[in-house]
C-alpha cells in the first residue's frame, strides 16, 4: 500500500508518494542515514512546520506544511507523472472494491508551483550538469534545501548534515555520523570464519577491506591484518594448518599465506572469479571453484601450476570435502540453463579427489541458488543450504507463501536418497540460507539466513525422524509444506546484518557468525541458543548512505513475513538466471528475464518496456505493493537503496583485460557490429545497425524498438535497447529469457532481420560478433 502524506485541509495540494523525498535526497549527492529497525517502528510525534521565508518562486501564501509537501513530491527528472499526485484513496472505495483515484490535489496553487519549480530546476540544470556535477545527477529541491523546512541558501554538504539518533536493528541506540552518498568507506565486511587446527586463532576473511584478520581466539585481539587481493570470497586451511588459502574474485588469483609468519608467500593465477578453495588430504592437489568460468581448477598444491579444469555447473562457488577426503562436493549459485519456462535445476558436482575427475552430478530439481555444504563428523549426513523459487506462476499473493522456499537438501547414509526439507515456518521465513555447520556430536545443524538476519537451529534426531516417518514425495521434496519445520526447527537466533559464514569452536559450545554488513561477529552459546557476546571489528563507525542501502538490499524484513528481499532475485547484487511473470503486467503477461544490476547507472529507463524512469520508481511503491506486501521503505531508506544500486561497480571483463589488445576474432566482430552495409553491398538502415541501438559506454541508446522478439503474451512490441554491460555472464537472453545463448538471439529469434541484419552472416562470423560483444 502506498504511503501518502496528506496536505493541510483545504489547500488542495497533492498527497505524495513515498518515493518523492527519497529521489530528492538521492540526486542531492548526500543522504542522511536512518537505520531500519527490526521491530515495528512506533508512530512518530506530529511534526511542526515553521512558516516559510524567502519564497521567490512559490506562491507567497503557502504554509510550511504546504511547502514541505511540494518539496517532497517534486523532482524534475520524473516529469509529470499522473500517479505522483493522483494516488489511490483507500478511504474512497469504488463499486468493484478498488480505491478510486484522488483528484483533490488538482488545484491551481499546485500547478503553479509545479510549473515554477520545473522551470527553475530546468534552468539550473543546464549549467549545473555541464560545469559542476560530473555524476550526471539532476538538481532537485533537496540539492539545496537538504531537508530543511525553510527556504534558504545552499549549504555545503559538510555543514548541512543534521544530527540524528537512530536504532540499529538488533543493536543499541547511537548517533550515526553522516557520510556523503559517494564516499568510499573502508568497512571490513566479514564474510567467512575459520579456526586454526589448534583452536588458538580465528581467521576472519574481510571482503571489503580485502584482508584476513587474524584474531586471538581467547581474547579476540587482533594479531595481524594480512592484505590479500581484490574482493576475496573463499578461505581454507591446508590439512597440516601451515598454509591458508584465499581466493580473490576480482583478480582471478589465489593468495597463499604462511600461517607461521602470517605473510603472503605466493599469488597464483586461477580461473574466472575464483570462489571456494580446498586442498585434498594428501596435499597433492588444490581445487578452486570458478564462478564465471563454471569450472573447478585443479592445481599442483606445491607449485600452483594448473593441471586441468573440470566442468562444473553454472556459478560454481562453494566446496566441501567429505570427512574421509575421497570426494569433493561443489555447489552453484546459479541454476543450469534449461529450456524456456521450465523449472530451474541446479546440481552438486561430485569430484573424485584421488583421480581429479568428475564422479557424479547430483541434480537439485526446482532449486536456483545453492550455497554452503557441510558434513557431519562421521560423514553419514551431508547438508546443503539453498532456496527453491516458484517462478513458473505469477509472482502474486505473497501472503499465501511459497514463492521463495528456503530449504536444505540432505543426503548420506543416515538419510538415504537425497531429500529436500523446508526451513520456513508458517509466519516466519528463514530467508536465503547461506552457511551450514553441524555440531561435533551430530545433534544440531546450524544455518545462517542472510535475509532473516538469524541463525536457524535444527534438532537432527527429530529431523531424521520426520524424514523416515513419512512417505517420501515422488519429487524428493517437502519444500512446500510450511508446517514441516515445526517438527525439527528448535530455535531462530537473531544476529547482525547479513550473516554469512560461521564456524564452531572445537568443543562445539560456541558458534561464531560473521555479520557481513555490520562488521561484527556474533558468538552464540549453543547450549542456550542465545548470542552470548559480540566481537566488534575495528573500522569506521560511520554508516554511509551506500552501506545503509546495501543493508536494505540484503534484508528480507520488508517482505511479508520476511519472505523475500532484493537479493533473492539478485544474488550477490547480480541476477538469478531465471525468468519471472510479475503481477504488475498482468497474470501470464510479459514474461521477463531478470537483469544484472551492476553498472545500471546511465541505462535508464528501467524494465524491458522502459516503464520506470529511474531507480526510485522501480524500487519504491511498485516494489512495496507487488513484492513486499508489507512494510514500506521510509523516504531516506529508499534513497539509500537507490544510491547503493546506482553505485554498484561492474566486475572486471575477462574478455577485455586492461592493457590487452583485441584478438583478431574480436576485431572482426567489432567490424560486423559497426557495419553499415551487408555482405551483398546493400545498405543497412541506421535503425537496424547494432551500433545504433547499442551505442554509448553501456551499450544502449536507452530508446524503445520493435526487434521482432515479442510474444503473443506480451503487452506491446516495443522493448528498451538492452545494455551490453557484462552480457557474457547474464544468460538467458532477450526480454523473456527465451534465448539460452547469445547465438540463439540471431539463429533462432531473428528470422526477419529485425534485430540487426544478421541472416547474411556465417557461423564463424556470428562467433566473431559474439566474441566482440563479450568485450563490452
Regions found by a protein language model. Give the residues of each.
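Long, charge-rich boundary regions
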Residues: 123-146, 152, 181, 605-620, ...
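N-terminal secretory signal peptides that target proteins for export/translocation
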Residues: 1-10
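Extracytoplasmic c-type cytochrome modules immediately beyond a signal peptide or single-pass transmembrane anchor
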Residues: 26-170, 516-532
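Periplasmic c-type cytochrome electron-transfer domains
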Residues: 72-84, 90-92, 176, 192, ...
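Predominantly soluble domains enriched in secretory-pathway, periplasmic, or organellar proteins
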Residues: 31-36, 97, 119, 155-553, ...
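Bacterial N-terminal signal peptides
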Residues: 12-28
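Short microdomains enriched in Cys/His and/or Lys/Arg
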Residues: 103-124, 162-181, 270, 586-602, ...
